């Protein structure tokens, strides 16, 4: 059986920014031990001759072919813009000179 210490549970809780009581710490340690023991069962599985799985579903190239299509005219796209400049949307700067 995998032993999970109180310190390990407290460390994990701290990483997750969780505050847990001593009772919850003990309960969480038991839960984590059960999870780790369950996962350890995979070590005893006979995988001889089984090809590794890279994806849970056997999907290949589910994307469509790229096709160039006519978009909306630039004038129409910019028609309702508050401000434009040189045929592009003009938006307020979000970075000051120090960040740029």
Curated annotation (Swiss-Prot):
* InterPro entries the UniProt entry points to: Asp/Glu-ADT_sf_sub_c (IPR036113), GatC (IPR003837)
Xref: SUPFAM superfamilies: Glu-tRNAGln amidotransferase C subunit
Q: Which GO terms describe its molecular function?
A: asparaginyl-tRNA synthase (glutamine-hydrolyzing) activity; ATP binding; glutaminyl-tRNA synthase (glutamine-hydrolyzing) activity
| Highest taxon of source | Bacteria
Q: Please name the top-level EC class of this enzyme.
A: ligase
Disulfide pairs here are: none
Q: Which Pfam family, any one, appears in the UniProt record?
A: GatC
> Which terms under GO biological process does the entry name?
glutaminyl-tRNAGln biosynthesis via transamidation; regulation of translational fidelity; translation
Q: Sorted alphabetically, which keywords does the UniProt record give?
A: ATP-binding, Ligase, Nucleotide-binding, Protein biosynthesis
Reaction(s) this enzyme catalyzes, per UniProt: L-glutamyl-tRNA(Gln) + L-glutamine + ATP + H2O = L-glutaminyl-tRNA(Gln) + L-glutamate + ADP + phosphate + H(+); L-aspartyl-tRNA(Asn) + L-glutamine + ATP + H2O = L-asparaginyl-tRNA(Asn) + L-glutamate + ADP + phosphate + 2 H(+)
UniProt-listed Enzyme Commission number(s): 6.3.5.-
PANTHER family linked to this entry = GLUTAMYL-TRNA(GLN) AMIDOTRANSFERASE SUBUNIT C, MITOCHONDRIAL (PTHR15004:SF0)
Role played: Allows the formation of correctly charged Asn-tRNA(Asn) or Gln-tRNA(Gln) through the transamidation of misacylated Asp-tRNA(Asn) or Glu-tRNA(Gln) in organisms which lack either or both of asparaginyl-tRNA or glutaminyl-tRNA synthetases. The reaction takes place in the presence of glutamine and ATP through an activated phospho-Asp-tRNA(Asn) or phospho-Glu-tRNA(Gln).
Quaternary form? Heterotrimer of A, B and C subunits.
The family classification in the record reads: Belongs to the GatC family.
Official protein name in the record: Aspartyl/glutamyl-tRNA(Asn/Gln) amidotransferase subunit C
Which species is the source of this protein? Staphylococcus epidermidis (strain ATCC 35984 / DSM 28319 / BCRC 17069 / CCUG 31568 / BM 3577 / RP62A)
């Amino acid at each position: 059986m995998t032993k999970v210490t109180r310190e390990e549970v407290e460390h994990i809780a701290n990483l997750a920014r969780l505050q847990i009581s001593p009772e919850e710490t003990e309960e969480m340690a038991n839960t984590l031990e059960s999870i780790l023991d369950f996962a350890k069962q995979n070590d005893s599985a006979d995988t001889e001759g089984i090809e590794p799985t890279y994806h849970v579903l056997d999907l290949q190239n589910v994307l469509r072919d790229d096709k160039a299509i006519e978009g909306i005219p630039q004038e129409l796209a910019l028609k309702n813009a508050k401000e434009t400049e040189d045929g592009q949307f003009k938006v307020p700067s979000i970075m000051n000179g120090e960040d740029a």
